[in-house]
Amino acid sequence: MRAVIPYKNENAKSRLSPILSKKDREEFVELMLKDVIKALDDAEVVNIDILTTSAEGIPNDFNGNVTITEPGLNDSINEYLQNANEPILIIMADLPLVTGDHIRKIISFSEDVVIVPGKGGGTNILFIRHPNEFTVKYHDCSFISHCEITDELDKSMHIFDSFLASTDIDEPHDIVELMLHGKGQAKEYAEKRFGSETGKGRVKISHLSKLSGFV
Amino acid sequence: MRAVIPYKNENAKSRLSPILSKKDREEFVELMLKDVIKALDDAEVVNIDILTTSAEGIPNDFNGNVTITEPGLNDSINEYLQNANEPILIIMADLPLVTGDHIRKIISFSEDVVIVPGKGGGTNILFIRHPNEFTVKYHDCSFISHCEITDELDKSMHIFDSFLASTDIDEPHDIVELMLHGKGQAKEYAEKRFGSETGKGRVKISHLSKLSGFV
């Protein structure tokens, strides 16, 4: 099997702009990507590809393949799937709460397709055993689209139920979840930016931080 | 073991008022309560208590105990826990995505305390093996409070990771999750109010509904 991470660094995550500048967001998305790569490493996924429109913001120590593609998430992933000859795990780069344990479970199901929904009808992770036959359709309630595509192919499907894996970081209030439940580098960054010590060895959202209005 | 459901019907869920009238919200919260009771029934939890400030909006076919308490969620639950002499599952009434399978798993962990976090630092479900010793503290990031209380008691803790059980229905966009992932009576109600058929045997959010602005 291989994992593929679609990734955009430049001016990414514009919905976080009320609390993070462009430069900060670019730093933050790279840390989230590092957390996702670490989860894959922890699950002993050795073949990792990044699909990106520019080589900016790829971690220096990343050992996998980086493919520069034209803009267009669906087209670039579908081309990738067409050329794949082994099971493919498509995992988004904004999932810093995902762990190696989640990945191990997701790739161990026997169903043809495993879907991890994102908030609001998104698709955070897709594991596809026979990728040549599959077409992705991200955006516009992709969770429903991917269920329908799987049905139409007469493939079996497992919907993976995890709060942590379903929490993609798009908006300020998602960073609250990251601070509460995270463990990696993106969480550390958020704590430094928005946290204050509670005195009990935990970090809470500082009432002085820009995030306090979003809790 | 026993399950206890804190419940408020009258003028409940005010954050849903942009899309549901007071009367509609009262109908909707009763359906969510029915779904929670069904999940407990499915898990063969036979002793179910409802703590409520008024007998309004209790399902007619509910066979358990209804206790009318003074307002004040923490005080009424803590009094309940003080008098308990068996493990207690505290489950909120606004969890229509929770299933019998979740409940069965939650009550089967060996840890002293099992916590199902809610969005934004809430606590959706708490399973407490030794309830006399425990004090709940809902509101103001109760997830952290309950972790700290468990730590201070030197008890073991399991944090249960489920997107469905962590999705409490507070705001319009939560109803999107209910329509996408629900199976019970509250989901049916939401579909009738806000859905339209896709022609593929699925229901999508109608662009004509009040919910369309929240997707």
Swiss-Prot record, chains A, B:
Homodimer. The keyword Nucleotide-binding applies. Keywords: GTP-binding, Nucleotide-binding, Nucleotidyltransferase, Transferase. One of its GO terms (molecular function) is phospholactate guanylyltransferase activity. It is an enzyme of class 2 (transferase). InterPro entries: CofC, Nucleotide-diphossugar_trans. This is 2-phospho-L-lactate guanylyltransferase. Pathway: Cofactor biosynthesis; coenzyme F420 biosynthesis. It comes from the Archaea. One of its GO terms (biological process) is F420-0 metabolic process. Its EC number is 2.7.7.68. The gene is cofC. PANTHER family: 2-PHOSPHO-L-LACTATE GUANYLYLTRANSFERASE. It catalyses: (2S)-2-phospholactate + GTP + H(+) = (2S)-lactyl-2-diphospho-5'-guanosine + diphosphate.
